Amino acid sequence: MEPLFFIGFVVIIIVILVAGYISSLKRREAMAAVAAKLGMQFMPNKDRYMARRYNFLDKLRRGSNRYAYNVLSGTYQGHEILIFDYHYKTGSGKNTHHYYFSFFILQLPASFPELIICPEGIFSKIAQAVGYDDIDFESHEFSRKFCVRSPNKKFAYDVCNARMIEYLLSSVRSPKDNTDLSIEIEERALAISFNSCLAPDKIEPNLNRLITVRSLLPDYLFTRR
């Protein structure tokens, strides 16, 4: 009985590995098709430099064994864009956990202090890593549904203006959107991210969400510097 059990166990492991490989290959092909549609370059291989280049962004400096993959890069609607799947791990041995998610970066023409906007609940996981309090707003609904943190409150209020607040609230009210959208701004990067890898057909719609967020940043943030 034991040899049969062992053989069955090995077969199950092989099936899981093969299924994982096929799934990764299909995603790679689908992401390549998205890149072609958007007129962007596509690099499927692991990119550890990306993690080092943007390690000032909170979500990209967590854990260990950090790398980007399925990287789309290029210009979209006049903005320099990076889109990629991302991985990091925490713990070791039996307590090892792997995290995979989608990340979008738009290059800004000026440098800014750190600002993080996350749906309430998601931010609690990283609250201890950020040494400043949640910022409150006149919109009680926005303050209930989002955590906003920055060492520069004036900058946070400038970014979270009335139009931005309404847009973000509409995103959590709409079931068709990914409601786990998080926003980070620091240095010259405007980033949005999610808690998992988006389906390839969700990449373009969420790239357009990134462009919308950029359009809601007040012009004076760039002209007065």
Can you describe what each PLM-predicted range is?
Residues 1-10:
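Feature marks short, highly hydrophobic, charge-poor N-terminal signal-anchor/signal peptide-like helices
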Residues 30-46, 50-52, 57-225:
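Charged, low-complexity intrinsically disordered regions
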Residues 15-38:
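Transmembrane-cytosolic junction motif
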